[in-house]
Amino acid sequence: MTLISPPAAVQLRPQALSEKIALSQARQPAAAPAGPKTLIVYDNPPNSEFSKLGMVFGIMLKNLMGHFDSNADLLPVQDYVAGTMQAYDATFYLGSYYGNPLPPAFLSDVSTSRKTVVWFKHNLSQLAWNPVYEFPARSGFKFSGMRGMNAAPTAANPEPGFFDTIGYKGKSFVKHYVFNTATGIINADPDIGVITVLDKARATVIVPVSNPRTGETVPYITRSGNFWYVADMPFSFTGPRDRYLVLCDLLHDMLGVHHAESHQAMVRLEDVGAKVSVQAMKTLTDYLHGKKIPFSIAVIPRYEDPLGVFNNGMAQTIPLSEATHLKTALNYALPRGGEIVMHGYTHQYSNLRNPHTGVSGHDYEFWNIVANSPVAEDSTAWALGRLNAGLAELASNGYTPVAWETPHYHASALASKAVAQVFDTTYQRVVYFTADKPDFKPAPNKDFAMGQIFPYVINKDYYGQRILPESLGNIQYDIGIIDSTSNAMNTWQDIVTNAAYAKTVRDGFASFFFHPFLLEPAARAPGYQDFQSMIDGITALGYTWVAPSQIP
């Protein structure tokens, strides 16, 4: 999977092979962000299995602040000191843990501050129900309490319903919900805080949320002067049609940063390695070039099949210098609007099945997905070695990437930090961790990891990366007959629908990737026809097609 690339001015700094390509050298320090100064306060209850859940949500919000050139500070709520928020333009409180006791100093400052305060989900009762703070009179609305499922789901009634449908800009954003009747486990976040507006001169409902089963509608996002209330935690169970996009858009208003309406689209040809079909690449290149659509190519510099899965049991390595098909495809595509994104070094790990075949393009490179842990060698230095090796392989064959994309969008924290030292721009989704060496075993204070999609450019994320968004996903077919790992379905219509939702973000991108092997006869799929339909559908929505290097 791949993302977008940087403008020429922020591409990799040129280094000579004779200097051994000192690509691990850190970039020059950037100027301090010019955006609003923001504070993110999160729940961090002691000795709970969910102690660090608030932190991972805080990291996700901090990443979004990177779109606004704001290098947000993170603070556990128990460490809050009176007067702290007055040094910030905006304070966000993430109420992820029900009943977490909040410091009186924090509650008092929220009550009296004239700076922007945005409160998410839980624990508003500690402010709204304490007469000392005169909350209803000050805010113009009252807090009634929390609501969850309409009833407990059962095998006979697996979908009893909840407040799951957020209405915004003519779209219905439906929250994720899956109930496993065998285990009784609910995969959802149904709880919301219910408020009632008492004084419309003081409080305004910005976004409603409805409960289709009961017919009720209540406020989802409410504003009272400098105070905003978001009824749930929009960082849980996110997706390309989720209420997370509503928050991403409204952050402009919450922060007072008014980006112009702008909608750009990007397409990336994915997992292009030594055994790519030259004909498939030429077909896609000619189509995009004919449409005057720039594109990027996620290139795997070195091919490895250590177990001989596709070579009659004999291990096979193909360096780029010997990858005739790949170089032919690249040399045809680059003069016709293509740009290279470096997609890992080998896009696989060691001689292990991680988890599929051990073959380049199939497996994870910077994460042990089988053990769900960092790889044994994990360190910034180890990751830098692989990044440098991949760049050297490209450079020695005359190629320069405009961005980086992590294989399967999943790398360790230390590997992501290494990427930020080498590449000025990445084009991807990212997994974030609450520790560099996370421990996920069920226990008090266990670590959390969370993947994040971005609808727009993030100038600096938690690991220091600049990120161009891949926000729509990709066409998928059930091709298990030729690849046992590929049996999901995601149609071109799904991608175009995702693009329609992405337009609700005022500067949201429509960015997706496509596997050229879907044009090969063995795939037994209408890949090329569907690719054209997808391009036409996104174009019809009014997006402007751009190359990664054109994004400022």
Name these PLM-found stretches:
Residues 155-225:
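Catalytic beta-strand/loop cores that center a nucleophilic Ser/Cys/Thr
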Residues 184, 374-457:
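Catalytic domains of cell-wall/extracellular-matrix polysaccharide-remodeling enzymes
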Residues 48-127, 279-282, 307:
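Helical hinge/lid and interdomain linker segments adjacent to catalytic or ligand-binding clefts
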Residues 71-74, 251-261, 279, 283-305, ...:
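C-terminal domain-boundary segment and adjacent tail
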Residues 39, 124-131, 294-412, 509-518, ...:
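Metal-dependent polysaccharide deacetylase catalytic core of the NodB/CE4 family, i.e.
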Residues 264-274, 278, 381-384, 388-403, ...:
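Catalytic grooves of carbohydrate-active enzymes
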Residues 13-88, 261, 288-290, 297:
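Aromatic-Pro/Gly-enriched surface loop or interdomain linker
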Residues 97-179:
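A glycine-rich, often tryptophan-bearing local segment used as a flexible ligand/cofactor-contacting loop or short
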